Design a protein with these regions (language model features):
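Transition-metal
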Residues: 1-134, 194-223, 248
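Short beta-strand/loop turn elements enriched in aromatics
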Residues: 117-139, 237-241, 253-264
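Short acidic-glycine-tyrosine-enriched beta hairpin
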Residues: 151-164, 178, 279-298
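Acidic/His-leaning functional-site neighborhoods
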Residues: 225-288
Length: 315
């Protein structure tokens, strides 16, 4: 039984994408590539397993055949989706539904709570995080009257920032920001504003005004996150989020460290540097851009090198 599986990402062209994902040692296709789905098991895209007994299967296929290898809890579908996003232009202002709304209105899809770790940001970069409306009537009227400057809340952003985005939160990643995103396994997005831009065929993208009004939480309440830091010989662990659907933490490795895996499957992406992962007597070289899952069969693992990773697991 495999204790570690490495994954080949899925790449998505986006109107707001660019070429910055090449910096992760990815061989990205031509075009404006906005997203790398580095750990994915969704109908719209699934990472491919590249090592071990499961090599050649997509993660979606492997989870369908053997879910107990990947998660302690039993889910109808793999619970998380992890992406790296290159916002070379502004993303649309958007919102995602909670589970119950998505289940009824999106053919059984999950809701989408997510979080962002800012990998890089140009000077003076901004994102939209929340809105100013105090009542549902005020929110709906601001949309109907297109009072975007009045409605949207902008926030400055810099490398190393972290944001927790519960379902129902109005948000948008701004131009010049590179994001690592951990989210529920959902691809449902409701756009409310898209800067009146057109795609390569001259068409504006669909907006979802009614659904945005249905699911956006009013008033907006920012969810504060606190960072707890644990120093170990060979590594510093920064705990970023421990929320309803997932926990997320940052690993800065500067030597050799042995760690216990959480009881469920743990997902990792190397985001800077390189090193070695040792699991059950086997060693694997890893570099920036590599993503892997430590399965239920793994208890402890060792990291060695000089690298920065983000780890996460389902709740």
């Amino acid at each position: 039984m495999d204790k570690i599986v490495f994954l080949e990402p899925v790449f998505c062209e986006r109107i707001w994408g660019g070429r910055n994902l090449e910096s992760f040692n990815f061989d990205i296709p031509e075009g404006n590539i906005g997203e790398a789905w580095v750990v994915a098991a969704h109908d719209n895209g699934s990472s491919k397993i590249v090592n071990g007994e499961l090599a050649g299967l997509t993660l979606k296929e492997a989870y369908s055949e053997n879910p107990q290898l990947f998660t302690e809890k039993k889910y109808d579908k793999y619970p998380l989706l992890i992406k790296i996003l290159d916002a070379s232009d502004n993303l649309s202002v958007q919102v995602h539904p909670e589970d119950d709304y998505a289940r009824v209105n999106e053919n059984g899809e999950l809701g989408k709570t997510e979080c962002w770790y800012v990998l890089d940001a140009k000077e003076d970069s901004k994102l939209i995080y929340g809105h100013t409306a105090k009542t549902k009537e005020e929110f709906d009227a601001a949309i109907d009257n297109e009072e975007w400057d009045k409605l949207f809340v902008e926030e400055g952003v810099q490398k190393g920032d972290f944001f927790y985005i519960p379902a129902g939160t109005l948000h948008a990643i701004g131009e010049g920001i590179l994001i690592y995103e951990v989210q529920q396994n959902s691809d449902t997005t409701y756009r409310v504003y898209d800067y009146d831009r057109v795609d390569k065929d001259g068409n504006k993208r669909e907006l979802h005004i009614k659904k945005t009004k249905d699911v956006t939480k009013v008033p907006f309440k920012k969810v504060a996150t606190t960072r707890e830091v644990e120093n170990k010989e060979g590594a510093t662990i920064t705990y970023l989020a421990d929320e309803r659907y997932f926990a997320v933490y940052k690993l800065d490795v500067s030597g050799k460290v042995t760690l216990e895996k959480n009881k469920t499957g743990n997902l990792f992406t190397v985001l800077e540097g390189s090193g070695v992962v040792r699991v059950g007597g086997d060693s694997f070289d890893v570099k920036k851009g590599d993503s892997f899952i430590l399965t239920i069969a793994c208890d402890t693992f060792e990291l060695e090198g000089s690298m920065f990773l983000i780890g996460s697991y389902d709740k």
